[in-house]
Amino acid sequence: MKLDVFAGQEKSELSMIEVARAILEERGRDNEMYFSDLVNEIQNYLGKSDAGIRHALPFFYTDLNTDGSFIPLGENKWGLRSWYAIDEIDEEIITLEEDEDGAQKRKKKRVNAFMDGDEDAIDYRDDDPEDEDFTEESAEVEYDEDDPDDEKSEVESYDSELNEIIPEDDFEEVDINEEDEEDEEDEEPVL
């Protein structure tokens, strides 16, 4: 196989993605290729060994998917995105979705042999209309300012967060004299 695009270039310097693009461009729009056929063409053109292709195959497949110039056409066929207008791609997707919607399976209705003619029997499969209206109310956390347990839990959580940042071993012990603080608050400023 000869690709005119790469005339004068060394095949060892070409990437598999460049060769794939050139092969698809040369074949034209109506000749999409299966992935395996595309890889075989690339291998033949580049002259790579089976082991070399096996090693490069995951990278090539990733490049093929992430490169914006290629498009998967289903059934592992690949083509160039430039072959298809954006509207045409959307139309293909829409027609596929319409085909899937038309073939919905009909659900079979089960019949309970024990409920024939008995109006008082309870059918536990029926949903209770009261259940449909039920919505679980979100429990709001209320803070009671007078409850010392709330303060303790807040202090404990704050301390645990501080311990994650700075271990307790690094703290210095400081004595706090509460009487001194109260005396300072009671004093009036001197003018």
Swiss-Prot record:
Molecular function terms from GO: DNA-directed RNA polymerase activity
Short name of any one Pfam family annotated for the protein: HARE-HTH
Presence of keyword Thylakoid: no
Top-level taxon of origin: Bacteria
PROSITE patterns linked to this entry: HTH_HARE
This protein's record includes keyword Signal: no
Gene Ontology CC: DNA-directed RNA polymerase complex
Annotated region (Disordered), positions in chain: 118-191
Keyword entries, A-Z: DNA-directed RNA polymerase, Nucleotidyltransferase, Transcription, Transferase
GO biological process: one example: DNA-templated transcription
Domain HTH HARE-type as annotated: residue spans: 14-83
NCBIfam families referenced in this protein's UniProt entry, alphabetically: RNAP_delt_lowGC
Function: Participates in both the initiation and recycling phases of transcription. In the presence of the delta subunit, RNAP displays an increased specificity of transcription, a decreased affinity for nucleic acids, and an increased efficiency of RNA synthesis because of enhanced recycling.
Subunit text: RNAP is composed of a core of 2 alpha, a beta and a beta' subunits. The core is associated with a delta subunit and one of several sigma factors.
Name this protein carries in UniProt: Probable DNA-directed RNA polymerase subunit delta
Naturally occurring in which organism (per UniProt): Streptococcus pyogenes serotype M18 (strain MGAS8232)
Organismal lineage: Bacteria, Bacillati, Bacillota, Bacilli, Lactobacillales
Gene field: rpoE
